[in-house]
Amino acid sequence: ALAPRGSASAAMAGLKVLITAGPTRERIDPVRFITNRSSGKMGYAVAEAARAAGAEVVIVSGPVNVATPAGVQRVDVETAEQMMDAVRAHLPGTDIFIAAAAVSDYRPVQPAAEKIKKTSDSLMLAMSRTTDILATVAATEPRPFVVGFAAETQNVERNALGKLAGKRLDMIAANEVGDRLAFDCDDNALTVYWPGGKRELPRAAKREVAAGLVEVIAERFATGERVSAVAAESDRNPGAAAR
């Protein structure tokens, strides 16, 4: 059973937890940007639950309208690159990394210096990939316990398990977006997967789901079972293991 909200649970006492939350923004011109519907509510709820469980918590946040939980250190960023830099800065000494942010996968190669005018019927934007923050942390040595999120519109389990294995995560929390779930909503439902197991967290308020997720993370962290960071690096860069 979940501990009541606000209880003095110490499941994460003495641990440093680093969380990303919210969306990122990638500038097109001075007045336009590419972003997504993430409200940051789930990431902030996880931060609150981890703090209530006794952890030292740092949250690296994209632009959101969510209050910072008491006792949580907040680092505000805007772009995926800024989020990556902030995560790198706070990663040393981190025991658990939880990637709850909805990070832009692409960014404009050359943002316009001035507002783009309507001069034609179409507009082509050259885009480049942003750094994969989750994969980068998963390949770090020494490596924290790495938890990813998978927000999917279809084939949730298949896509989540593919991400779990492909990025060699310790755990992934998956949910289907839409139908008043996940993005910009107060409720959520998650299926949590790890190598060899899973746990359902049924639909409830995000704070309750977050408390359940933190409980599962603490249980798995306590087992001492970890996925190898060396393998994660070799997956991202074939031949790395031979260096």
Placement of each model-derived feature along the sequence:
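Internal gly/pro-rich beta-alpha loop/helix module
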Residues: 1-6
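Solvent-exposed alpha-helices and their adjacent loops that cap or buttress functional pockets
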Residues: 8-12, 66-68, 89-91, 138-140, ...
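Flexible, glycine/charged-enriched surface loops at secondary-structure junctions
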Residues: 9-14, 60, 223-231
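A glycine- and small/hydrophobic-rich beta-loop-beta segment
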Residues: 63, 71-135
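Glycine-rich phosphate/nucleotide-binding loop
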Residues: 106-207, 212-243
